[in-house]
Amino acid sequence: LTLEFTPSKPEIKLYNLVNGYLQRPDLMAFTGSQRHLISLILRKRLGSSTYAIASTLERIADRLDREVTTGDHHEEPEDYFVEEELTSDEREAFENGPAEDELEANAASSLQDAIRAEAEELRGFAALAHSISVNEKARKLNEALEKGFAKLREIGAPEKAIIFTDSTKTQEYLAQSLKEAGWGDGLVLFNGSNNSRESQEIYRRWMQENAGGDLITGIPTSDRRKALVDYFRDSGRVMIATEAAGEGVNLQFCSMVVNYDLPWNPQRVEQR
């Protein structure tokens, strides 16, 4: 089942602004050999949600401000993206790609005004993204769940769906959006940290219920993952997950997969 959606006028404006920015030949934010890869990831964030691209744009603007203040012009992937926000494919691409170029200090100092102007422009894009509180893609997700669950009821399958997204910012937004649409009961989040308030409460109850048993490994990261999967299996209806749930987690009891964000590698879809 594939559902089409039409972005709102503000979403289209944001897309055009960011896309136009990325097409410029003389960007201050990333001038090195990894520009193409960084641009691809930015477009992925843009396609994920306004919340995902807003935080990324602000992070790039912050790095530009630091560049002017400190004179440190060496670019690293973590200057642009939070580590947890990078998928394994994106991390691998950075690791296997050529090293970033380092600007000469005397050349960079002559471009400080341009760097400041670009940082201000990026913050303007981020402000526009923040102003878009409702994403049309998320609206369509509610319709997709309703149609999907109706089909599951028709064939007698368990009403459980997992939604995959690349961004924890998008994950947080979708959780709030689905709660407002009436999907709050049985909603669970799964990501690399699993430290949301709801996840911590599920983990606390799971530890109490299994105290003295052999399910508890004593490894908090592993036990948190197990607690969330058990909750989803026994009580949940919808899990919103990042790539962390795509590997090494048994979710065969789940009846429906929603690819909210598509991965670069088509094999990832099969793994999901």
Predicted regions and their residues:
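Inter-lobe connector of SF1/SF2 helicase motors
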Residues: 1-121, 180
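Conserved interdomain hinge at the start of the Helicase C-terminal
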Residues: 14-17, 21-31, 132-168, 172-177
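Conserved helicase motor "Helicase C" RecA-like lobe of SF1/SF2 P-loop NTPases
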Residues: 59, 167-201
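Glycine-rich phosphate-binding "P-loop"
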Residues: 120-147, 211-216
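Conserved helicase core region in the C-terminal RecA-like lobe
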Residues: 168-169, 238-244, 264
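Conserved helicase ATPase core of P-loop NTP-dependent helicases/translocases
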Residues: 188-242
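A short beta-strand element within the Helicase C-terminal
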Residues: 249-261
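Conserved SF2 helicase motif VI
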Residues: 265-272
